[in-house]
Regions:
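Terminal targeting signals and extreme-terminal segments of soluble enzymes
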Residues: 1-175
């Protein structure tokens, strides 16, 4: 961009269909409010929608316990949970899982630190092809230090399978 390298990428691809189908995990889907109790991102205040235009590509329904920040009352817990599907009605696929891994506002919003949080490093894993239907996505941070925070993400499909994971290191938003 303007003659300056802004991003580098290292990617590894595999055939998900060639992987064994056995699953042994202690991971469990997040505790999220039922879909009909969640709040559509489309009802977000205009300033929030302007900050995150990517959200318009999804039908996002936020767990009401996670969105106090949108109304000036962050809950102080570094976690966001939402139901997600593509806005155009397509069923989820591997590419939409990748997009979902970085689709929610930074968890720093819930900590009372809204704003752009530049990514330093992002690692993503697509674990399986998703089943049709809504995806559940959860972002969490456990450590804010040195002007940075880590954010872990999990994406679960409608069959209750963990289909995507990510870890991101980002800079704190500037106030």
């Amino acid at each position: 961009q303007d003659g300056v390298e802004r991003i580098t990428s290292l990617t590894t691809f595999a055939d998900l269909g060639a992987l064994p189908h056995d699953v042994s995990t202690t991971a469990t889907p997040p505790d999220i409010a039922p879909l009909d109790r969640c709040v559509s991102a489309a009802s977000s205040p205009e300033h929030v929608r302007r900050m995150a235009p990517l959200m318009q590509r999804f039908d996002l329904r936020f767990d009401p316990d996670c969105i106090g920040w949108a109304h000036g009352a962050p809950n102080g817990v570094g976690s966001m949970r939402a139901w997600m599907r593509l806005a155009d009605g397509r069923e989820p696929d591997v590419m939409s899982v990748l997009m979902t891994l970085d689709s929610l506002p930074p968890t720093t919003f819930a900590l009372g630190m809204p704003g752009w949080a530049p990514t330093i490093e992002l690692t993503t894993h697509v674990r399986a092809r998703p089943a049709p239907g809504w995806l559940v996505v959860q972002h969490r941070t456990r450590n804010v230090a040195g002007g940075m925070f880590e954010e872990d993400c999990e994406v679960w499909d409608s069959a209750g399978r963990l289909v995507g994971q990510a870890r991101q290191l980002a800079m704190l938003p500037r106030h």
